[in-house]
Every structure is written in C-alpha cells, then in structure tokens.
C-alpha cells in the first residue's frame, strides 16, 4: 500500500534557452569580412562604415579590418565601424 498521497502537478519548470547575445569582436580586433561583430535584440549598436545589419539586427563586417566602437550625434548613439585592413599595418 502506498504511504504517500499523490502529489499535484505543477505548471512551472520551464525556461527558454539562452540566445548567446552580445559583442563578439572587440575594439581594434582584426576580423575578416562576414564576421559577426554584435548579436543583439533591437539596435543597441548601430551600423557604421563597412558594417552591415542582418534582419535580426546582427552587425557584421563587410570588409576585412579593425573593429571601432564610437558614440555619435546628439543622441550619443553607439556605432560600430570597420577600419579597412590595408596589409601594411602591424
């Protein structure tokens, strides 16, 4: 005979998987074209020179070069640009 009453069910106990958002390449880092620089929700960072934006607001490099983070304008928008790699640097 069971010595414990049946427990009720719960509607909790689930969580969504982490989305691995954030900065993937930092300032002055040399990266190849096509590399992801920032994975984000919305436009926390805006695309600057030589940077493209995917449909999920992911920023990626359009050319080989060095990552540069800046704030611009009256709204102090954070922008990410790529300074093209010429081959003579470093």
UniProtKB/Swiss-Prot annotation:
Keywords carried by this UniProt record: Ribonucleoprotein, Ribosomal protein
GO biological process, one term: translation
Domain of life: Bacteria
GO MF terms held by the record: structural constituent of ribosome
Signal peptide region: none
One term under GO cellular component: cytosolic large ribosomal subunit
Disulphide bonds in the chain: none
Chain ranges passing through the membrane: none
InterPro entries hit by this protein: Ribosomal_bL27 (IPR001684), Ribosomal_bL27_CS (IPR018261)
Pfam families cross-referenced by the UniProt entry: Ribosomal_L27 (PF01016)
Gene3D superfamilies: 2.40.50.100
Region of interest called Disordered, as start-end residue ranges on this chain: 1-21
Family per record: Belongs to the bacterial ribosomal protein bL27 family.
HAMAP family to which the protein is assigned, alphabetical: Ribosomal_bL27 (MF_00539)
Designated name of the protein: Large ribosomal subunit protein bL27
Protein source organism: Neisseria meningitidis serogroup B (strain ATCC BAA-335 / MC58)
Recorded name of the encoding gene: rpmA
């Amino acid at each position: 005979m069971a010595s414990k009453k049946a427990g009720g069910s719960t509607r909790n106990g689930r969580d969504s998987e982490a989305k691995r958002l954030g900065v993937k390449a930092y300032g002055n880092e040399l990266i190849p074209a096509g590399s992801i620089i920032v994975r984000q929700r919305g436009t926390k960072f805006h695309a600057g020179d030589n940077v493209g934006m995917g449909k999920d607001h992911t920023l990626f490099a359009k050319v080989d070069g060095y990552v540069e983070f800046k704030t611009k304008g009256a709204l102090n928008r954070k922008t990410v640009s790529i300074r093209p790699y010429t081959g003579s640097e470093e």
